[in-house]
């Protein structure tokens, strides 16, 4: 483990581990957009995915154009800071998985050996994340959309108080 490692992904099944890598990236880069995600993990990492893109907006999943090739459950959907809901492609062959694991290291994301998911109908794998070296996800400060209005009201209140005390405070 390197000192620059931020997150370790433990996964059950190869594709769930890849999903965990993407979720870890989103934690590390909370202001990231879909375009940033596509730049960080380009389509060239996963050429055999059977879809056009590694990541799509979740409302696009399940269309004839992309079949059922994306994670679609609510807990699998990636929610970006800009409000975008992103679905991640499901198919990750061994070579593609090895490429995304190598790429993830550039962002301080390491993968523990994944374990096989339980076999059988309705069984699916999962992932969990462990923060390393004292790292915690950055807290995104919410932008105050009406800050100027609050500032204006405060200035008006101060002006009214000064006026009141100057003319009626005697």
Regions found by a protein language model. Name each.
Residues 1-170:
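Intrinsically disordered, charged low-complexity linkers and terminal tails
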